[in-house]
């Protein structure tokens, strides 16, 4: 994948800026740290999903599909996906834990000149009561959130609580084969199907350059309740 890294040898925090070129020639600059946990780096799934949002298959004709739509990103980390959506005209809330808010706000500030919608950062801890999010968003975006087994049920609770029946949830994840990863992925989909319908987006509909056979994009939508017959 043809994005680039910038770093400083004099930086004690070992920070790196990942540069992601958009289709219009502008670039997103994403600050990340080599230490500090999984949320401090830009994962490949975030790049794949960000570039998918730019594809003609997703964007549609005329105004972009995200223009003036409300978007919530879960597990934002560096905010890559949410920032891409904001540059495409969406009104975005990027969310993660308290300890990642400074990094999110730094990346928002670094890219604010590219934003054509709006973007703000908020704290959201999966599994806890939803506060400060008054209505279901049009879209929920999530990249590489299927990672820790202990976070699956809290994540799905938050998805169920914060989404509406018309919310389009787009989940991008890397399929990992080491250790317990296959079991974690299997459990995620077993739990997901209890309350949600989902479908996989074919690889040929991903960005032609930023794609990989082991990185998947799925559309998810909350199941509508059925009345007893």
Curated annotation (Swiss-Prot):
Major subcellular location class: cytoplasm
Modified residues (Phosphoserine): 8
Modification type N-acetylalanine: residues: 2
Coiled coil: none
GO MF annotation list: ATPase binding; protein-lysine N-methyltransferase activity
Matches recorded under InterPro entries: Methyltransf_16, SAM-dependent_MTases_sf
Pfam families: Methyltransf_16 (PF10294)
Keyword tags: Acetylation, Cytoplasm, Methyltransferase, Phosphoprotein, S-adenosyl-L-methionine, Transferase
A biological process from GO: peptidyl-lysine trimethylation
Reactions this protein catalyses: L-lysyl-[protein] + 3 S-adenosyl-L-methionine = N(6),N(6),N(6)-trimethyl-L-lysyl-[protein] + 3 S-adenosyl-L-homocysteine + 3 H(+)
Its job: Protein N-lysine methyltransferase that specifically trimethylates 'Lys-315' of VCP/p97; this modification may decrease VCP ATPase activity.
Subunit description: Interacts with ALKBH6. Interacts with ASPSCR1 and UBXN6; interaction with ASPSCR1, but not with UBXN6, enhances VCP methylation.
The protein's name in its UniProt record: Protein N-lysine methyltransferase METTL21D
Native species: Homo sapiens
Gene name of the record: VCPKMT
């Amino acid at each position: 994948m043809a994005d680039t890294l910038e770093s400083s040898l004099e930086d004690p925090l070992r920070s790196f800026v990942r540069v992601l070129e958009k289709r219009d020639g502008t670039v997103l600059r994403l600050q990340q740290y080599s230490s500090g946990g999984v949320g401090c780096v830009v994962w490949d799934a975030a790049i794949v999903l960000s570039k998918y949002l730019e594809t003609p298959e997703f964007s549609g004709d005329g105004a972009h599909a995200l223009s003036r739509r409300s978007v919530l990103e879960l597990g934002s980390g560096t905010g890559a996906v949410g920032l891409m959506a904001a540059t495409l005209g969406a009104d975005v809330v990027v969310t993660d834990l308290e300890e990642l808010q400074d990094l999110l706000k730094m990346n928002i500030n670094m890219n604010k000149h590219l934003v054509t919608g709006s973007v703000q950062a908020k704290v959201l801890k999966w599994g806890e009561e939803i506060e400060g999010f008054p209505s279901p968003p049009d879209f929920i975006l999530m990249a590489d959130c299927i990672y820790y087994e202990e976070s699956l049920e809290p994540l799905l609770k938050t998805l169920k609580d914060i989404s509406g029946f018309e919310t389009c949830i787009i989940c991008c994840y890397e399929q990992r084969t080491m250790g317990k990863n296959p079991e974690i992925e299997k459990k995620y989909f077993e739990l997901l199907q209890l309350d949600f319908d989902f479908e996989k987006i074919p690889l040929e509909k991903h960005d032609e350059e930023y794609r990989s056979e082991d990185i998947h994009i799925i559309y998810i939508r909350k199941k509508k309740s059925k009345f007893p017959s």
